[in-house]
Amino acid sequence: MKTFSDRWRQLDWDDIRLRINGKTAADVERALNASQLTRDDMMALLSPAASGYLEQLAQRAQRLTRQRFGNTVSFYVPLYLSNLCANDCTYCGFSMSNRIKRKTLDEADIARESAAIREMGFEHLLLVTGEHQAKVGMDYFRRHLPALREQFSSLQMEVQPLAETEYAELKQLGLDGVMVYQETYHEATYARHHLKGKKQDFFWRLETPDRLGRAGIDKIGLGALIGLSDNWRVDSYMVAEHLLWLQQHYWQSRYSVSFPRLRPCTGGIEPASIMDERQLVQTICAFRLLAPEIELSLSTRESPWFRDRVIPLAINNVSAFSKTQPGGYADNHPELEQFSPHDDRRPEAVAAALTAQGLQPVWKDWDSYLGRASQRL
């Protein structure tokens, strides 16, 4: 059974780097005028040569976004269930080597968090944990997903990679989507930053979206942690390759791409490569031209000033007032957090800023009487 690993083995990191850096202004102009991007076009739009075409790139990305999604921007919020982790990663505040207080939410904790989140108006929930299969694994998810499903319109997860059969079971329990970020597609760099635990297995993580597709999960989220490798352009191109593979082989699923830049955290590292804000806009808009139909997400890792200016261009899914520690909404303890968010505005403030620009915040985009995909299938 083929997976993206087979395609990944055909891709040479250094060759891609040279090809991206070798793109010219003529290549960029050709890509901007293409009705459907080729892989070469995507390289051109990620290249240094495209930096002088940012306005044209943003204008086309905005047109495509409005054509596909209108003026709507969906809101979601992460609910951190646990900061227990059995991995040792150099860049994460939850890393097992960090001496921080550990907490896993029980049924009462989850009820308090859910009430606080619903009071703010959120209906789309992203469940996040550290990666600890023994204590925050399938038994934990089986206990708590049904109650959360009853309260929220959409449930997605960002947890440790699971088996195909486990994803199929979670789908029956009401799971709509899974976000799984490769962190970096450069295998040697990946090994340097994942020192202990199951996350050391590069290919188990790389093939997770294939397992999600085979399990019939409705939405699959991809991304690289920008700044972990020494070349964000190549990592971003690898995300594009991954997306194209999945769309070809699991066309029934929907896809999203996120653009997390390395943020400060307990015991964290400095970025190996710096993507500035103009380059982040360039990358976001390139993905919109590559895949006009997918969801592009921007989290509270970015500043309020930046988010208010970039969301109207190509973003159609945003978080707001994110707390990156378990219990953060009902009882805030910053010392437990995974990383420090940059945009700490309340959701109504973010919504007001977008409304002032003619956008329509969407808190809920379906109702229970319509059924869920897992029920209909």
Curated annotation (Swiss-Prot):
Binds 1 [4Fe-4S] cluster per subunit. The cluster is coordinated with 3 cysteines and an exchangeable S-adenosyl-L-methionine. CDD domains: Radical_SAM (cd01335). It comes from the Bacteria. One of its GO terms (biological process) is DNA damage response. The keyword 4Fe-4S applies. Its EC number is 4.1.99.19. GO terms for cellular component: 2-iminoacetate synthase complex. Its cofactor is [4Fe-4S] cluster. Residues 71-301 form the Radical SAM core domain. It catalyses: L-tyrosine + S-adenosyl-L-methionine + NADPH = 2-iminoacetate + 4-methylphenol + 5'-deoxyadenosine + L-methionine + NADP(+). It holds the Pfam family Radical_SAM. [4Fe-4S] cluster binds at C85, C89, C92. InterPro entries: Aldolase_TIM (IPR013785), BATS_dom (IPR010722), rSAM (IPR007197), ThiH (IPR012726), ThiH/NoCL/HydG-like (IPR034428). GO terms for molecular function: 2-iminoacetate synthase activity; 4 iron, 4 sulfur cluster binding; iron ion binding. Keywords: 4Fe-4S, Iron, Iron-sulfur, Lyase, Metal-binding, NADP, S-adenosyl-L-methionine, Thiamine biosynthesis. Pathway: Cofactor biosynthesis; thiamine diphosphate biosynthesis. The product 2-iminoacetate hydrates in vitro to yield glyoxylate and ammonium. Catalyzes the radical-mediated cleavage of tyrosine to 2-iminoacetate and 4-cresol. Belongs to the radical SAM superfamily. ThiH family. Forms a heterodimer with ThiG. This is 2-iminoacetate synthase. It comes from Escherichia coli (strain K12).
